[in-house]
Amino acid sequence: MNLGEFLYKLVHATEPYEFILHWGMYKDLLEEYQLIASSEKYTKNIYPMGLTDIINQNNTDFIPYFMSEKIFFLDNNIIHTMLNNEDVQVPYDYSIMLDTNYTSYIKWFLNGRNQPHLLENYMNLFSSGEDKFTVSNPKHLAVYENLYYVELFKSIDQKKYVECNKLEYTISENEARQNTDRIISLFYSGNSKEILNKFIDLHQSMTLLLIGIWQIQFGSKASAKNKMKKLFKYVIDKVGIFYEREMVIALRYLEDTKAVSMLNKINKGGKSLNQKELLEKVENIAWDFIVPRVMEFHVNTNKKYSYFIPFFLSHDKKLKELIKLFNIKGMLLHRKKDEYIPFSNLDTTDFFDKKGLFNELKTLRENEILLKREMVHEENINNNFSNKVKEIKTLHEILKK
């Protein structure tokens, strides 16, 4: 028995009792694990009252991470308690992530003024390697203001606003500034810097992958299947990391470009961009692609205290569509290690097999190729992903033809 077999069974499970049955079969292997899973056959909706109605509205800005509001939790202690016919008390909490443009709406809401602060402000701050934060830097000030207004927004007296339509805060403006100062100082502490570096590496790898997708889409007249074979090779040679959900999305795009509107932001015949502008545009799209992985990180970091249910709030239609393209059914988390494995309702091995790409997927997992991919990824990190300059040049030339 191994973890891969267990996850395969979870992908195909539909009834809550099936999850419990599979857990029981693998309980010795799962001693240090806990599970968050969703099933339409489960009877309980764990979302706050009214939120499901909001999520189900057309053009809603609320995007849930999990594919259903019918969510349950499992670990060996929960199973043991259930078998003893005792009440199961499971602590869980919620978090709402905002896209950075949404924070400008908050400032407008609180102040009646709108000064949009785009995602690149955050990227410039946290990926630039700067060791000092100062509000005399306009880009730093933009980030500070966004965080400050979010702190105020979080402290709105809900009862007063609902009953009297009046904005009052449960903290002072000075307390909001102090909270913001603490957040900024956390970003510059050793541990937080290490975490941010992981996200920056992830973002740069995603940038490389996206460049490869567009190189192949616009540089080849092959079928979607053969384009995908080229992309598998590109992953081995240039990226190193195999991003499963993004490769599924890439194939859907290569089969039908209309299926992934986010990837249509780069196209032939559009506005002429120089290489620097093109790279900046690709990097901004890459930030959107890693949103689900940031949500997963928050689920993992809070696992010691409670099960965590994340949501994302955005007014960007293409970003909302992108997040919904790969339904997350659940997540398996290790209690002590930094290990978490999200899984969907899609059997990706079967998916690629039916598309005639099983051999390419199998090749990725061969020991020799695994070693090569690891070396490619390490080299990318050590060279600060300098190869993206060459790859963006290639893409730029393809788009000009």
Regions found by a protein language model. Name each.
Residues 2-308, 323-401:
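Active-site-proximal, substrate-binding regions of enzyme catalytic domains
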Residues 309-322:
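Extended hydrophobic secondary-structure segments that form protein cores and membrane-embedded regions
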